[in-house]
């Protein structure tokens, strides 16, 4: 139990400290609002697409593919998104935050934490790629659609047909989805990755998380966040507790245990990804609610992930 807690703290608290550093540097005017805007733009258009491309391109999709598992990841992701979206439209009084609330409630840091968690427990991270394949493309497709249809900007309050066309265009031209598609094709074709290219891409990919986290901290508006305490708390509970509580027992009944179950823990119950904040900002949303949920899920996930690992180990689902 203590070992799991220490690992969870080591995995999540550095993310929180980077956000805190960004906030303090902004208060001291080392990081400006212009830096936040440019960092968000760079992560969205360059660093994150490169990271996802490299993660998929260097994975042997053919050798490790497990159709039922990938299908379960996709089904759980789709079901959770649609239910959260429907309930948010029904119960959120402030319709301007529906898009941010939905994305912050479902979108995990699967690509960043998945491999690290599995590797720490089993010494290999091979099955994290299957979870990423079944969830991350859907994360981004739904994010484009939801953030477009629920945009608070005036020009988005047009006819449904125009909104759907805009969503489709957003999916086709989204740099994150283009990176995923390119990486998947590269992996399927089993193309070699030249050492020079791999090192260059690795350097760019390594900038994704630090830049995004610094930007979240630097762009965090404390007073504005106070106005979103209730939706922040609800989104945090959904992200860290409700989604794992619903889908992990189902996964066990279907026979997904050991590495596959650990990957699902990350997919369902890890921190809200900083990429969600970047995408929300780039698509015309305020970003305050998303940033708040990133902070709270990062802070509390060390405890909740430890609980889920303890539960699975005590039941003999992971060894």
Tell what function each PLM region has.
Residues 1-319:
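Alpha-helical transmembrane segments of multi-pass small-molecule/ion transporters
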């Amino acid at each position: 139990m203590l070992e799991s807690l220490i690992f969870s703290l080591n995995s999540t608290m550095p993310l929180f400290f980077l956000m805190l550093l960004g906030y303090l540097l902004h208060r001291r005017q080392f990081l400006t609002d212009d830096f936040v805007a440019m960092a968000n733009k760079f992560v969205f258009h360059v660093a994150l697409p490169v990271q996802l491309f490299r993660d998929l391109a260097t994975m042997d999709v053919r050798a490790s593919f497990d159709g039922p598992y990938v299908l379960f990841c996709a089904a759980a992701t789709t079901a959770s998104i649609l239910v959260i979206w429907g309930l948010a439209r029904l119960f959120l009084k402030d319709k301007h935050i529906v898009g941010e609330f939905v994305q912050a409630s479902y979108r995990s840091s699967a690509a960043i934490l998945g491999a690290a968690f599995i590797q720490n427990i089993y010494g290999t991270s091979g099955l994290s790629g299957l979870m990423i394949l079944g969830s991350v493309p859907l994360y981004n497709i739904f994010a484009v659609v939801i953030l477009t249809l629920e945009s608070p900007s005036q020009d988005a309050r047009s006819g449904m047909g125009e909104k759907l066309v805009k969503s489709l265009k957003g999916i086709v031209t989204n740099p994150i989805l283009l990176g995923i598609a390119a990486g998947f094709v590269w992996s399927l074709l089993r193309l070699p990755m030249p050492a020079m290219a791999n090192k260059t891409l690795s350097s760019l990919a390594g900038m994704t998380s630090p830049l995004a986290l610094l930007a979240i901290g630097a762009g965090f508006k404390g007073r504005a966040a106070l106005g979103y305490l209730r939706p922040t708390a609800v989104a945090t509970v959904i992200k860290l507790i409700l989604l794992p509580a619903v889908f992990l027992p189902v996964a066990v009944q279907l026979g997904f245990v050991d590495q596959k179950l650990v990957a699902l823990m990350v997919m369902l119950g890890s921190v809200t990804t900083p990429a969600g904040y970047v995408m929300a900002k780039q698509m015309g949303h305020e970003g305050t609610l998303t940033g708040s949920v990133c902070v709270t899920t990062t802070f509390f996930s060390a405890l909740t992930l430890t609980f889920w690992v303890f539960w699975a180990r005590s039941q003999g689902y992971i060894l």
